[in-house]
Amino acid sequence: VNDISGGDFDENLLKTVAETKLPYILMHSNSTYQNMHEKIHYEDIIVSLNYSFSKKINELQKLGIYDVILDPGFGFGKTIEDQYKMIDEVQHIGFEKFPLLIGISRKSFIYKPLGKLPTEINEETQNLHRKVLEKGAKILRVHDVADTKKTIEEMR
């Protein structure tokens, strides 16, 4: 179950995940659907992510949900600087206890500063994929599957 709300938008979602024992993707985002894309000032995005994940993981485990994948929520309420810090310090996100999912494919924090379209940043995206995988990310959410597969094969 891929949940962009951390269980906050649907009161029955986490109960259903617990009952079905499905893997659960916990994404970091702002507190409400209406403001999830508003940029928030974080003193330290990595500390904020880990604090938020820690609280949510405790809630999940109390419900019997242990198969958790963490998604730091690229593109959801974070500045360009915060997102590049998340890439640079991805190894510090999530306590190394949970797989980390990274979804940076075709994100505006990459293409807008370059003056390109989302479909024109594949090379830049693959370079960032390589970087996060080298730093410990386990799962990539992608649009360009063949190129990402090639990137992963080249890393082996």
Go through each PLM region and give its residues.
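Active-site-adjacent loop and "lid" segments of alpha/beta metabolic enzymes
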Residues: 2-62, 77-156
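Active-site metal-binding loops of divalent metal-dependent hydrolases
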Residues: 74
